[in-house]
């Protein structure tokens, strides 16, 4: 009977540990990327991004763990749309009902812009739904999650930088 010794190249204990470490880090990174993507889950604004974000003529931007105008944001997501304003407005009414704080700008008896402060996602992690309506069914919806106060939101929206 002949005994063969199997030789596995690069299969030392050190490389096995390194391979395991790489796999664990990859899984953790994937989980970290999924969490911000689910940030607005439970809010109606999530439906707006899902339904209209990839529609022709729409522009959607999503940034995670970024700085915008000097403010540190965990999630920034915006949608510029060219139609479906009435449908989007109806969807956002659901978030309005659940909002902790509501700020709206009214022109000629019509709400044209504003923001809703939602319940925090975690301690010191506030969530905001901002919107602006234009003419012809156009408008913008923004979701922000971060350590921002309502005053910070007002500064972001109305400062001239």
Please place each PLM-identified region on the residue numbering.
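Generic secondary-structure transition motif, activating predominantly at the C-termini of alpha-helices
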Residues: 29, 53-56, 92, 96, ...
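Bacterial Sec-dependent N-terminal signal peptides
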Residues: 1-45
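Surface-exposed, polar helix/loop patches in the mature regions of secreted/periplasmic/lumenal proteins
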Residues: 101-161
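Flexible, processing/modification-adjacent segments and terminal tails
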Residues: 38-54, 148-161
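Mature extracytoplasmic domains of secretory-pathway proteins
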Residues: 75-121
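Early exported N-terminus immediately downstream of N-terminal targeting peptides
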Residues: 41-89
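Compositionally biased, intrinsically disordered low-complexity regions enriched in proline and serine
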Residues: 4-12, 18, 72, 77, ...
